[in-house]
């Protein structure tokens, strides 16, 4: 397993477990998922306050409460800013959200807080103030964003003193807008249209980790591409029983940059069958990047 070093004693696995679907699991199923991940060297668990209406965090928190010492083995991340159909970066909402997250997870701190979706009416200085407050109180260690482009991050950073450590973005073999424009520079192809202001390049230039969510998904919440009839060539190469060449998923030209050189990329994987998917991605991670969902 490869890890990102955020500080001298803080390492984040380059495969992460997305916890959205934990809301549909029993406590025992969630425990199996978590312990299987930890046994594979995965210490990164990604939550959001809206996952299952908070139930995902509650189930996870019950597990932490029942197993003293388990929390110390983890890097736990959660996200906030979505509520009642709005994206809300107000200080009041962020404070309230973090307190709710901590209560549901039954912990006194989270390692990372991401702002889930960009608030067009954000007040950067207000966000900066609440970030400092949360850091001083020990409730949050690191801060980042999710689904933001370059200029949104620059705007936010104008009022935030702390470095944004991560941007969580959708990316998979079947969803590649993040890198299409870079590959199709100076062409007439639709893929050459710059839709995100060069967000990937901006993150790399500024040491911001890219967390890719739903790396097995097609389109926007279109289900996974594994076993899907729309991708016969790809699926003909994938064996779930024995992976002889884990790099096969990154052989396509559009994803060649994901080979093991890029240590500041993180992938987040949603897992319903933990033993199969974690075993497969553990093998694949030797030549690729982090998974987070």
Stretches with model-predicted labels:
Residues 118, 122-293:
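Beta/alpha (TIM)-barrel catalytic core signal, keyed to glycine-rich beta->alpha loops juxtaposed to Asp/Glu
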Residues 5, 12-16, 43-44, 73-79, ...:
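Structural preference for beta-strand elements that scaffold enzyme active sites
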Residues 29-30, 56-59, 90, 123-127, ...:
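Residues at alpha-helix caps and immediate loop-helix transition turns in enzyme cores, especially N-
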Residues 18-28, 80-92, 116, 121:
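Active-site mouth loops of central-metabolism enzymes
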Residues 1-8, 58-68, 97-103, 153-158, ...:
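Short amphipathic alpha-helices and their capping/turn segments at secondary-structure boundaries
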Residues 102-123:
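Active-site groove signature of glycoside hydrolases
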Residues 1-74, 136, 218:
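N-terminal binding-site loop/beta-alpha segment at the start of enzyme catalytic domains
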Residues 25-38, 89-105, 151-155:
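Short, acidic/polar
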């Amino acid at each position: 397993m490869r890890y990102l070093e955020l500080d001298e004693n803080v390492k984040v696995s380059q495969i992460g477990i997305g916890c959205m679907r934990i809301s549909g699991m029993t406590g025992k199923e969630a425990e199996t998922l978590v312990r299987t991940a930890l046994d594979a060297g995965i210490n990164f668990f990604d939550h959001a306050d809206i996952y299952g209406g908070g139930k995902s965090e509650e189930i996870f928190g019950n597990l932490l409460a029942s197993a003293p010492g388990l929390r110390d083995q983890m890097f736990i991340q959660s996200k906030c800013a979505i509520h009642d159909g709005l994206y809300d970066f107000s200080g009041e909402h962020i404070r309230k959200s973090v307190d709710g997250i901590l209560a549901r997870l039954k912990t006194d701190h989270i390692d990372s807080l991401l702002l889930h979706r960009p608030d067009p009416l954000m007040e950067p200085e207000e966000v900066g103030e609440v970030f400092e407050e949360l850091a001083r109180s020990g409730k949050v260690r690191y801060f980042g964003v999710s689904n933001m482009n370059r200029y949104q991050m620059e705007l936010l950073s104008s009022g935030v003193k702390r470095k944004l450590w991560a941007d969580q973005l959708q990316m998979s073999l079947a969803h590649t807008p993040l890198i299409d424009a870079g590959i199709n520079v100076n062409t007439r192809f639709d893929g050459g249209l710059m839709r995100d202001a060069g967000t990937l390049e901006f993150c790399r230039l500024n040491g911001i980790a890219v967390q890719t969510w739903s790396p097995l998904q097609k389109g926007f919440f279109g289900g996974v591409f594994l076993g899907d009839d729309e991708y016969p060539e790809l699926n003909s190469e994938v064996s779930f029983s024995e992976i002889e060449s884990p790099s096969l998923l990154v052989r396509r030209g559009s994803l060649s940059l994901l080979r093991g050189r890029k240590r500041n990329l993180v992938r987040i994987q949603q897992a319903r069958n933990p033993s199969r998917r974690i075993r497969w991605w553990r093998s694949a991670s030797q030549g690729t990047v982090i998974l987070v969902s």
